[in-house]
């Protein structure tokens, strides 16, 4: 399997590439990656693996895309994006990277005739705020940020190009992934900071209330789900090309309790609360989420809070 990872140097992309190089099974035939092409605007550490090819370039540059897809491609993971906070502050940049670059990728693949699997990392940002009292697989997206709008349009494009046979498109709606490195462009970064800083013995000021429920998933778990998306048979994706991932719905206090169980009871004394009105409105009232079809076809969450906090700091 010839694989291209777009956004390979990001938080999820690095873990996905590492898993691919450990021969994670891909597709219905469970084949390993024979070649992994990394594409990002800036390359990280070089790989010694002969199965890795690096293409440094802007994902909105069709020449860079053509180099990445050169020689044929069987599976594309599109992970690159400008996150919510940055996309709100820099509208033109968000539009170019999140939307126009996605169109350019799809058009480049259409022109090439490769017809690969195309795994699109969408987002729960498509639902906007306030959310309905329950989210399920029939809930109609209603994004309230540019980032969510870009992701929803991306889903529709992936489904349409899939319907027309230009690609084998599969979109997964990704929740907040922990524990990301520090970032100024992501509104939900405090969820990652909480786990990372409390695990490291630091004090943490939480910008939402202790009883605020959020949706949680570790990086290894989202990589599991992205890889699983490649294995779904055609009859599954013909019926539905966008999948809502199962999540753990946990309050801040439940996550802190799990951290205390893993790292010691002193963890509970290192957190204080100063709710921020904007973050409280955006992240403090996530409703129950039901996605029985996604679970039926094999997508999974981390299991429980203890597993989440243990896996959250794993490299891949």
Model-derived segments and spans:
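N-terminal Rossmann NAD(P)H-binding glycine-rich loop of SDR-like oxidoreductase domains
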Residues: 1-26
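Amphipathic terminal alpha-helices
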Residues: 288-295, 300-316
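NAD(P)H-binding glycine-rich loop region in Rossmannoid oxidoreductase-like domains
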Residues: 56-97
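Glycine-rich NAD(P)-binding loop of the Rossmann-fold in SDR/ketoreductase-type enzymes
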Residues: 60, 89, 93-104, 141, ...
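Active-site Tyr-X1-5-Lys
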Residues: 129, 142-170, 199
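Mid/C-terminal beta-alpha module of Rossmann-like enzyme folds, strongest
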Residues: 225-279
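NAD(P)-dependent short-chain dehydrogenase/reductase
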Residues: 159-214, 219-224
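Conserved Rossmann-fold NAD(P)-dependent oxidoreductase catalytic core, especially the SDR/UDP-sugar
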Residues: 103-146
């Amino acid at each position: 399997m010839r694989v291209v990872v777009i956004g390979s140097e990001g938080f999820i992309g690095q873990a996905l590439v590492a898993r691919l190089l450990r021969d994670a099974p891909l597709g219905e035939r469970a084949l390993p990656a024979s070649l992994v092409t990394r594409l990002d605007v800036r390359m990280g550490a070089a790989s010694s693996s002969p199965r890795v090819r690096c293409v440094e370039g802007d994902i909105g540059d069709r020449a860079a895309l053509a180099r990445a897809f050169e020689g044929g491609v069987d599976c594309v993971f599109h992970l690159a994006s400008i996150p919510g906070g940055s996309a709100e502050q820099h509208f033109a940049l968000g539009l170019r990277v999140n939307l126009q670059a996605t169109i350019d990728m799809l058009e480049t693949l259409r022109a090439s005739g490769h017809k690969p699997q195309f795994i699109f990392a969408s987002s729960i940002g498509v639902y906007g705020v306030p959310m309905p009292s329950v989210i399920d697989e029939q809930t109609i997206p209603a994004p309230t940020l540019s980032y969510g709008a870009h992701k929803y349009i991306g889903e529709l494009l992936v489904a349409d190009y899939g319907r027309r046979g230009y690609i084998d498109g599969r979109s997964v709606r990704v929740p907040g992934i922990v524990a990301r490195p520090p970032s100024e462009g992501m509104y939900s970064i405090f969820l990652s900071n909480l786990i990372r800083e409390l695990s490291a013995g630091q004090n943490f000021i939480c910008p939402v209330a202790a009883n605020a429920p959020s949706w949680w998933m570790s990086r290894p778990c989202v990589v599991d789900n992205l890889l699983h998306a490649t294995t779904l048979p055609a009859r599954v994706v013909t019926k539905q090309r966008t999948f809502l991932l199962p999540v753990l719905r946990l309050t801040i206090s439940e996550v802190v309790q799990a951290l205390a169980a893993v790292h010691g009871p002193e963890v509970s004394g290192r957190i204080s609360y100063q709710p921020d009105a904007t973050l409280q409105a955006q992240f403090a009232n996530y409703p129950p989420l039901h996605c029985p079809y996604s679970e039926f076809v094999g997508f999974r969450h981390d299991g429980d809070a203890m597993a989440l906090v243990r896996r959250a700091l794993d490299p891949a």
